[in-house]
């Protein structure tokens, strides 16, 4: 926010420069100009976070209703897992915000996994997937949990074999891809990716405010947005309409053996150690858990962590610096985050073949 000179100083300046009675008019004009500039700044900030009008789909895997229908069936089908009891929707449950509500995911044989299940909303705009960014497309990501030994524990060959044994899948694949031998690993992942790209957050109160409806959010949330984009520094990483930069940062959480993005860097490169992808704040769960491994159980704990600046180490993001926040400011920031929640869209479960 721009600094504004005290009124007496402004009046004295105006009297020297312009003289006499015109001074008051000049000061009034300066105040108006400052207010106009502030409104322009706010409008520019709103534009940065305004939701897009359409959903992107890659040319190599274009959107079709038939492909979405097939991908939806595959997403909810437990036959894609070795046990035959776990589907993608088991962990990415639409009733739980397309996650599972657990501190950490549970994998094959009910073995706890080291990371929390991320929601699958708004992935159409993503550029890197998984907490460590090891997948560069949704098509590549769709294969990973299926073939991971500690997740669904399947091979794509076995997936294809099982699907070919289900008579009802042949017409679904043929309608989606139109080839003589449509049931194949590439088509499985393409359909799953296409369906996931259709999972988009609904319009939230913040969106209506960003479009000009001043009554859509309260004064506390508006102050919270000013904190989010200003003093608190949240928008440095939680940017764009999805409130994520899709990048990777070490935010100073208590470290274990999980190096995150650093796993893919040479040992001599420390910058990416303990760096994980910035999660979206859209439809943020207000009851936790939070962070890539669910180690912070409440929003209050998250705020405390950022206020303290995280654990100091060479890889700590330069954005992580201690700062002070009053109780009112904390409430305002939470009030803003609550405006990012939309009413969950109703989803009809597919009739599996």
Curated annotation (Swiss-Prot):
It is found in: Periplasm. Its main location: periplasm. GO terms for molecular function: calcium ion binding; cytochrome-c peroxidase activity; electron transfer activity; heme binding. Its EC number is 1.-.-.-. Heme c 2 binds at residues 234, 237-238. Keywords: Electron transport, Heme, Iron, Metal-binding, Oxidoreductase, Periplasm, Signal, Transport. Heme c 1 binds at residues 88, 91-92, 292. Involved in methylamine metabolism. Essential for the maturation of the beta subunit of MADH, presumably via a step in the biosynthesis of tryptophan tryptophylquinone (TTQ), the cofactor of MADH. This is Methylamine utilization protein MauG.
């Amino acid at each position: 926010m721009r600094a504004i000179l005290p009124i007496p100083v402004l009046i004295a300046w105006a009297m020297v420069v312009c003289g006499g009675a015109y001074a008051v008019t000049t000061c009034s004009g300066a105040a108006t100009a400052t207010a106009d500039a502030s409104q322009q700044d706010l409008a520019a900030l709103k534009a940065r976070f305004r939701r897009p009008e359409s959903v992107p789909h890659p040319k190599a895997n274009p959107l079709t209703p038939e492909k979405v229908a097939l991908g939806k069936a595959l997403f909810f089908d437990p036959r894609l897992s070795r046990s035959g009891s776990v589907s993608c929707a088991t962990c990415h449950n639409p009733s739980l915000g397309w996650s599972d509500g657990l501190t950490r995911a549970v994998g094959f044989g009910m073995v706890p996994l080291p990371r929390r299940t991320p929601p699958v909303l708004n992935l159409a705009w993503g550029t890197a997937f998984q907490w460590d960014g090891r997948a560069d497309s949704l098509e590549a990501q769709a294969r990973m949990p299926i073939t991971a030994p500690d997740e669904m524990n399947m091979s794509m060959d076995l997936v294809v074999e099982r699907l070919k044994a289900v008579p009802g899948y042949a017409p679904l694949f043929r309608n989606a891809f139109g080839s003589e031998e449509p049931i194949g690993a590439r088509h499985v992942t393409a359909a799953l990716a296409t369906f996931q790209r259709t999972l988009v957050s609904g319009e939230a109160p913040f969106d209506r405010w960003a479009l000009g409806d001043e009554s859509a959010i309260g004064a506390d949330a508006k102050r919270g947005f000013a904190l989010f984009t200003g003093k608190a520094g949240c928008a440095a990483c939680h940017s764009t309409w999805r409130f994520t930069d899709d990048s990777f940062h070490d935010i100073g959480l208590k470290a274990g053996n999980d190096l995150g993005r650093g796993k893919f860097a040479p040992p001599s490169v420390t910058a990416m150690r303990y760096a994980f992808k910035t999660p979206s704040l859209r439809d943020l769960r207000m009851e936790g858990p939070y962070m890539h491994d669910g180690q912070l159980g409440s929003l209050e704990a998250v705020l405390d962590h950022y206020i303290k600046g995280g654990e100091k180490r060479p890889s700590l993001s330069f954005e992580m610096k201690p700062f002070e926040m009053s109780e009112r400011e904390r409430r305002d920031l939470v009030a803003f985050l609550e405006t990012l929640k939309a009413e969950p869209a109703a989803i009809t479960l597919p009739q599996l073949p």
